[in-house]
Structures are given as structure tokens and as C-alpha cells.
A protein has these predicted regions:
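Surface-exposed beta-strand/loop patches in extracellular or lumenal glycoproteins
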Residues: 321-340, 426
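Acidic, glycine-anchored loop motifs typical of Ca2+
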Residues: 399-402, 505, 516-532, 563-575
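Non-catalytic cap/lid and distal C-terminal segments of serine-dependent acyl enzymes
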Residues: 16-326
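C-terminal beta-strand-rich structural cap/linker in extracellular carbohydrate-active enzymes
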Residues: 364-389
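Terminal connector regions
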Residues: 388-393, 404, 460-495, 580-621
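Intrinsically disordered, low-complexity Pro/Gly/Ser/Thr-rich segments with frequent PxxP/GP/PP motifs
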Residues: 436-464, 553-586
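Short, solvent-exposed loop/turn segments enriched in Ser/Thr/Gly
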Residues: 404-410, 453-455, 468, 529-536, ...
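Short acidic, flexible loop segments centered on an aromatic residue
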Residues: 414-435, 439, 538-556, 595-598
Length: 631
């Protein structure tokens, strides 16, 4: 290969023309030959330099060497499309390598299949995240790369934009910056047979130590979902930037985004001392830790606020508040952060009942500790001293937190260490704009080991459309994060139906009217204890099932359904609705208050509509059969 590169370099003389090579390698992960295109600086053969690498992920119907089918003037590799603002032109004037992998995922040998990456649907056994790490190792072994995370980035368009953010969030220990040109916001991913919905707006905690950039277009068909994502990431994700161009779906001003990566290479973020991670796979590495499980069902494993002092763990069906999966077994190995062959005091708190288990565990020869847990919620503390963590919170005096109004929270603080904490002062902070904190300081009493206390937070969000607010409880220089979902002021719904095993004509896939039965119960149109219901809001001559929110103790909201709108807007995303259960112990006459949200189609600018719902829990009437609508 060196001879070929040298001849190509000599053939272009001293012009800074890049070398664009189409190559193959044998993948052990896939058990097949895979293609890639590599863009090398024009003087690569003679410079002796090492280069940072941007891994590029193409979109639907593209290949490593082919632009999108049936859409002319979309070649961003090289040439004069996009006014010549292409990968090749950028590499020709910068010290960087770009590797464009091949997302080809044929279901049968040699099939001309346009859908890449084996996502939505997961229909083969090719797992591209596992192949990505193999490709990185191959490129580092065969080209003069600067082979560390600080000099490695991802970028991509459309489905490739989704992949860029997914790979950077799955492997932040390998990648220091990620960009996304108008990427799809949501796909099902993971092992075939138990793939799970992966929605970027809910995955913002995966990017500790990573700079991120989202490129949007004023005429892009995905722009509604991008704005939804920005509304979350802007207030929860540091080192996130976004840029909107007057453009339709594509790669406008590519050099602006590649310049973002060059700046990130020059000033990479350090490895985070505290990090969080969410993963769709049962087994995965992250920041030197290793997680394994016996999970054979859709779910997401969550490690939160991980440091040498401990972590929070759980496995859920969906984020942020899907059903926990305590039947799943987890085996977690820490990074080698502890003195080899020395014992550490480990405190484990099972949050559902506060049960505390404390053991002395010996680190192995590599300084790693090992933990066996299940998929329930746990706080794990490591060390002999006090270790504080924030637990659950409750909105006081209201069923949800409202924009523009004072919000009072009761927040639980745990001591997951092995010694009592001393009485001190807790300080509340936020980096969010237009947020006033009414209780910037609160006294925090002594907390016994394994115990908890409650504190309060009073705040007001002055933005009428904020969807989330993030705060930090600062105690003795330790910053403990908490994120609060926010909701706009909304009028009471003038009309709605309670579907408790009864049929109605509802919209599915955005605009299709379909007769469906929702919920399970006696079908009398009232909410009874023990029933599963849906709230249906009228839209013309049919109904839309609502996504619901409340902190009411009588309501179990852990079941959420996704209505795929791909056939309507071609994005791959979905509208959500809830199937809450009225808990069996809920008394007759108890009044339930809920915030209802429906997604109204108007491609590409859909609209979210909010309304409040109120109904009493009724005495059960005579029952008849009803079945629940599922995805």
C-alpha cells in the first residue's frame, strides 16, 4: 500500500490534492470482507506525520463509494456538489484522515439493499457497534493515526448522523467529539430478537467528556424531531452546540462542522471524573468498566454518577421512567482504580425498600472490584467514609412541575457510605438560563450510613416552553445532579374518553384511522382500581391516544407505547402514548390529575399539544372482556 500511496502522491505534484482510496479488510466480527473509503492528506506518503481521524457514517441508500441513489447533486465526498464543500476538499487542506465505512447490511447474499446499519428493523445478526471498534483497531494498525480518543471523532448524515451520535455515546472512552448532519432521532437497535427503542433526546447523559454538534436545516424533513432533541440537550448537555442552515436534508457547509472537530482535537475534554452511561446491549465496556448480564428482553442498562466512590444502577424497559427489570442479573467490574489486592468497604442500598448490605471486598491484581446486582435500582458506595447521593424527588402541592410558576420539590439525599455524614449546608446551583432558585442554600443534617434525609428545592423557570431543568446539589465540593421534567401551562381538555378495554377509532402512523381497543378493564369508560386505561383526545372524527404525566401515587405510568410514524414522515421516529394502571389500592372517589400530550401531524413541522385531564376513580361495574393495545 505504501508504494501505491507514494505513486499517487507524486502524480499530484505539490498540489494539496487528497488521496481517496477504496479499500477492504477481513472482518472477524462479521466473518466477511468489508469495504471502506479513506481520505488521506496529499502528502501522507512522505510527511511522516500522524493524523487525527474522523469516522464518517453515510445515510440511507448510500455506500462507502456511492452517494444517495435517485437524488443528483448530493455527492459530499468530492467534486462540485455542495459548492465543492466536500470531505476531499477539507482533507486536502487539513492534517486529518477521514474514514467512510460501509453500512451495507444485505439480508441475503449480494442483495441490493438500501437500508444500512441493521437498525429499525434489526433484521440480521450484524451488530455494527461491535464492528466499529474492530474497524478503529484496523485503521490504527494500518495507517499513521494518532491512536487515542482525544484524536478520534465521528460524523454522519441522516441515518449516519444517528449512528455518529450513537457510537459516540456508546464509546465515549474512544471518541472525543461527534457531529450529526440532520440525523434521524430514533431507531430500534441492539441484539436481534430483543432490540429496543433508542431515542437520542433521552440519551444525553451518555456524552460525558465528548463535544457534540447537531446540524439542522430550515427545510429538512426531520427538523421537528431535531427541535425536540435540542430542547432537552441545550439544558442538560455541556459542550453541545447546534447550527441551523438554510438547507434541506444534506451536509451544508461541511467545513464548518469539520472545523469543529479540528478544534476538539486541539482542545479535547479530559476523561470525566464522574460519568453516566445507558446501553442497549446486555454486555458492554465503558470507561474501563465492564458490564455483563443475562438479559434476553428489550431493555436499557443504566449506570449513573459513576466514580471511584460508587454508582447508581438499574435496568429499565424505556427512559426515563419505564418499568424496572429486577429479574435481570448484572455483573459489573469496575475500572482498575483501587489499590491492587487491597480490601474496600462496599455499601449497597436497594432503593425500593432501603435495605442495606455492607461487605468488605478485595480488589483483584488489576485494582478492579466486582459487583453482582439485579436490574432494580441500587446505590453502591465504595469507601469507609460518608458518600452522598441524590435519590427520588417529589413535586409538592402539584401533580407536575409547571413553567412560569414556583415549583417546590422534596428531594431525598442518601448516605451510601460506611460512616455518618456531618451536618453541613447544601447549595443548589444551575447552569440553565431563565431559572431562579428560591432556596440556594439548605441545612443538611447528619445522615447515618445507609440512611437518608429529605431536603427541599424551590425554583421558577421563566421560559414558558421549557421541557427540562437541571440542578446540582453541591455538598462539600461534590456536585450531585438532578433533572426535573417541566410542562407548559395548559387548559383543561374539554372532552376526552377513558378507554378501559373499550374500542374507538384512533389515529395511528400519524394519519391513519384505525379501530382499536385500548386498556384492560370492564369497558364502562370510567377508571376503576386495577384497570389499565388510555386517555383518548378527539381530533376531528377520530381520537389520539395521549402520553400522560403525573406524580399521583394511585397511577403506575411505567407502560409507554410507540406509534411509528415512518410511513407518514419517513423519519423513523414515533409518537408516544401511555397505558397507565390505576393501582389496586386506589380508593373510590380519589381524583386523578394528569398532563396529557399528543403529537399532531403537520410534516415536517409537527406540533405538540398539551391539556390537563381530571377524573375520579370509580367503583367497578360489571366487567366484560377487553384487551390492551400493544406495539
Amino acid at each position: 500500500m505504501l508504494v501505491i500511496l507514494l505513486l499517487l502522491s507524486l502524480s499530484v505534484g505539490w498540489a494539496a490534492e487528497p488521496l481517496v482510496l477504496d479499500e477492504t479488510h477481513k472482518s472477524q466480527i462479521f466473518g466477511e470482507t468489508r469495504h471502506y473509503r479513506i481520505f488521506l492528506p496529499g502528502d501522507y506518503a512522505t510527511s511522516g506525520k500522524r493524523y487525527p481521524v474522523i469516522y464518517w457514517f453515510h445515510g440511507w441508500s448510500e455506500r462507502y463509494n456511492k452517494p444517495v441513489r435517485d437524488d443528483p447533486h448530493r455527492n459530499y465526498d468530492q467534486g462540485e456538489d455542495y459548492d465543492g464543500n466536500t470531505i476531499a476538499r477539507f482533507v486536502g487542506s487539513h492534517d486529518v484522515i477521514v474514514v467512510k465505512w460501509d453500512g451495507y447490511n444485505p439480508r441475503t447474499p449480494e442483495e441490493n439493499y438500501p437500508r444500512p446499519y441493521n437498525i429499525s428493523p434489526v433484521e440480521t445478526d450484524r451488530q455494527f457497534p461491535m464492528y466499529f471498534t474492530e474497524l478503529v483497531s484496523f485503521i490504527d494498525a494500518h495507517y499513521r493515526t494518532t491512536a487515542d480518543r482525544e484524536h478520534r471523532a465521528t460524523s454522519g448524515l441522516s441515518m449516519g448522523g444517528f449512528m455518529s451520535f450513537w457510537m459516540a455515546g456508546k464509546y465515549p472512552h474512544l471518541i472525543s467529539s461527534a457531529s450529526n448532519f440532520m440525523g434521524s432521532s430514533e431507531f430500534s437497535v441492539g441484539p436481534r430478537g430483543f432490540d429496543v427503542e433508542y431515542r437520542h433526546e433521552e440519551m444525553h447523559r451518555n456524552y460525558d467528556g465528548v463535544r457534540t454538534r447537531l446540524v439542522t436545516g430550515t427545510r429538512d424533513f426531520i427538523r421537528f424531531y431535531h427541535q425536540r432533541m435540542i430542547g432537552i440537550w441545550k439544558y442538560t448537555r455541556p459542550f453541545f452546540e447546534t447550527q441551523e442552515y438554510d438547507a434541506d436534508h444534506g451536509t451544508p457547509h461541511m467545513s464548518d462542522t469539520f472545523d469543529f472537530h479540528m478544534r476538539a482535537f486541539a482542545e479535547p475534554l479530559p476523561r470525566p471524573a464522574v460519568w453516566s452511561h445507558i446501553d442497549a446491549y446486555p454486555n458492554f465496556p465503558i470507561w474501563g468498566w465492564e458490564v455483563a448480564s443475562d438479559r434476553k428482553q428489550p431493555g436499557l442498562t443504566m449506570l449513573e454518577s459513576v466514580s471511584s466512590a460508587g454508582f447508581h444502577s438499574s435496568v429499565r424497559e424505556w427512559l426515563p421512567s419505564g418499568r424496572l427489570l429486577p429479574n435481570v442479573k448484572l455483573w459489573i467490574a469496575s475500572g482498575g482504580a483501587y489499590p491492587p489486592n487491597k480490601s474496600q468497604l462496599v455499601t449497597v442500598i436497594r432503593l425500593r425498600d432501603g435495605k442495606v448490605r455492607r461487605v468488605s471486598q478485595r480488589a483483584d491484581a488489576e485494582g478492579r472490584l466486582r459487583f453482582e446486582l439485579d436490574g432494580g435500582e441500587y446505590e453502591v458506595g465504595i469507601g469507609p467514609g460518608p458518600i452522598l447521593a441524590l435519590g427520588s424527588f417529589e413535586v409538592l402541592g402539584a401533580p407536575w412541575a409547571s413553567d412560569g410558576k414556583p415549583v417546590s420539590l422534596r428531594v431525598r439525599v442518601w448516605n451510601k457510605g460506611a460512616a455518618p455524614s456531618t451536618a453541613t449546608t447544601l447549595h443548589w446551583e444551575t447552569t440553565n438560563s431563565d431559572v431562579d432558585i428560591g432556596t440556594p442554600s439548605r441545612p443538611l443534617p447528619e445522615i447515618p450510613p445507609g440512611g437518608s434525609v429529605e431536603t427541599t428545592l424551590l425554583f421558577t423557570v421563566r421560559d414558558p416552553a421549557r421541557e427540562i431543568a437541571k440542578f446540582f446539589a453541591v455538598v462539600n465540593n461534590v456536585r450531585l445532579p438532578v433533572e426535573i421534567p417541566m410542562f407548559p401551562t395548559a387548559a383543561s381538555a374539554p372532552e376526552f374518553q377513558i378507554a378501559d378495554g373499550r374500542a374507538a377509532t384512533v389515529f395511528q402512523e400519524g394519519v391513519k384511522r384505525v379501530p382499536l381497543t385500548f386498556g384492560s378493564g370492564n369497558g364502562d369508560g370510567r377508571a376503576n382500581a386495577g384497570e389499565t386505561i388510555a386517555i383518548l383526545l378527539p381530533d376531528g372524527d377520530a381520537y389520539r391516544a395521549a402520553e400522560l404525566f403525573t406524580n399521583d401515587w394511585c397511577v403506575d405510568l411505567t407502560r409507554r407505547i410507540s406509534d411509528d410514524w415512518s410511513s407518514y414522515d419517513h423519519v423513523g421516529a414515533s409518537a408516544k402514548y401511555s397505558l397507565p394502571m390505576i393501582k389496586p389500592g386506589c380508593p373510590v372517589g380519589h381524583v386523578v390529575h394528569m398532563m396529557a400530550r399528543i403529537q399532531l401531524p403537520n410534516a415536517p413541522n409537527h406540533r405538540m399539544e398539551y391539556s390537563t385531564i381530571e377524573f375520579p376513580v370509580s367503583a367497578a361495574a360489571a366487567s366484560h372482556s377487553g384487551s390492551s393495545k400493544t406495539k
